[in-house]
Amino acid sequence: MKGRTIFKGKAKGEVLMTSEDISFYGGCDPETGVIVEKGHELEGKSVSGKILVFPTGKGSTVGSYVLYALSKAGKAPLAIINESTDPVVAVGCIISEIPAVDQVDIEKLKTGQKVEIDAADGVISIAN
């Protein structure tokens, strides 16, 4: 799969996928990486150490700093893949140095899959 580079870098890991948008501010605990938004498909699951796949971000611009706090706490996702990366998630990935790609058909990815991402080239490979 090929997408557009948001922030370069490489990562290899397990997909955590949702069809719902994510608000990092108020929706994700910056100390634990657990999604805390009530009723969210990923409520109670941790983004830490995962290839986080979701359509786009939502909510406050403070979400960029929540991604940064996750990074500083060692609880950030390994990489982010979106259909369309919003400015809040883009800035969060850049300041936190989280590899990120968008313009991807995320329906081809499923929770638990192993993937490799080379965000500099926008390439996502599904491991066998």
What are these regions (language model features)?
Residues G3-A11, L16-S125:
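Feature captures the catalytic cores and cofactor-binding loops of soluble hydro-lyases/lyases
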